[in-house]
Amino acid sequence: MYLFGASGHGKVIKEILNASGIEVQAFIDDDLNVTECAGCTVMHESAGLTPMLVSVGANKTRQKIVERLRNENPGIRFGIAVHPSAVVSPSAVIGEGTVVMAGAVINADAVIGKHCIINTGASVDHDCVVGDFCHVAPHAALCGQVHLDEGVLMGAGSCAIPCVKIGSWTVIGAGAAVVNDIEGGVTAVGIPARSK
């Protein structure tokens, strides 16, 4: 496996893969000054390298990198990383490029899109739909049947009550409680969460 993004987030993903018995061949990064990360060589060209995970935390940046990699290498494959301590229902679906970190829980019939981050201790309950390029940050909780459109960031410790929908590229602030649907493209904070 190759990791695009020689970062702190990348170090965590490397350790997840290693804990799952998967070797990281190298990191790839655009910063020519970075030559080593977490004991691995950092390369500066990605042509022909596969399978890959994009180890960048920012949702929009991750999306742009994935698009670039697909354009450069139409045959690229993207892996999945799931920490051994994560609890993932056998009926859950996890899309390519997604990372599920230590202590996360994904329950029955949840659908996680492509290139998502389900971070440390986060929970995604039954029948949730998490769109591509979303990030459910550490200890955030989605109750049953929550729907996140593409690119949503659920901030650390935030929560969403059952059946709410959050529009694409919205940011839910740390510790916020979503009790009603939230439109796309906004930042919502507080208890209850309201767009700023």
Q: Which residue ranges define each predicted feature?
A:
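Glycine-rich hexapeptide-repeat left-handed beta-helix
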Residues: 1, 120, 132, 137-196
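Hydrophobic, well-ordered beta-alpha structural blocks that scaffold small-molecule cofactor pockets
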Residues: 1-45, 76
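Short active-site oxyanion
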Residues: 1-2, 24-25, 50-53, 168
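Short alpha-helical
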Residues: 8-11, 60-61, 93
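Short amphipathic alpha-helical segments
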Residues: 14-16, 64-68, 112, 183-184
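Phosphate-bearing ligand-interacting subdomains
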Residues: 32-87
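Redox-cofactor binding/interface segments in oxidoreductases and associated redox assembly factors
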Residues: 52-55, 100, 189
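Hydrophobic, well-structured mid-protein blocks that either form specific transmembrane helices
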Residues: 71-125
